[in-house]
């Protein structure tokens, strides 16, 4: 039997509708999302949040890869994403509205995680998801690897945060190690993970 090889490429604006559906489905029940996004119209809110990350962060100032035409999506910021602060300042009010009744929890979680983020230039995996009906085919690693490889070529770390314990071995196989284990009061335990160059 031949091994399945996903088709991975940089995303375009044409990929947005399917990529947003993929990310929304992947994050609908994700622990951090459940903790920080209002349960009222939850999937609609998650969908819009993921669209903001995909379009305003990934496509506008970062890098986005899709596998199999959007069945898997990875959104990265890079050391060249110098406009990130301005973009987050612009979309921040809408993100706060989407958090709704969970805004205080979102702000608390952000405050707990921020000190563990790299101060030096790094590739930051802002969001990644695989469509539930395409999981287990290697699309996750296929869509994350281009960013990992770009960080390696640049000689800078790659960084991510996850609140799903099942994700830890997946990222460890890609060379990431846990650099912080953050207990969020009344929320999900969250791990910061870094992949140093040469890992």
Curated annotation (Swiss-Prot):
Residues 6-198 form the N-acetyltransferase domain. One of its GO terms (molecular function) is acyltransferase activity, transferring groups other than amino-acyl groups. GO terms for biological process: response to antibiotic. InterPro entries: Acyl_CoA_acyltransferase, GNAT_dom, Trichothecene_AcTrans. CDD domains: NAT_SF. PROSITE patterns: GNAT. Its EC number is 2.3.-.-. SUPFAM superfamilies: Acyl-CoA N-acyltransferases (Nat). Keywords: Acyltransferase, Antibiotic resistance, Transferase. Pfam families: Acetyltransf_1 (PF00583). Detoxification of puromycin. This is Puromycin N-acetyltransferase. It comes from Streptomyces alboniger.
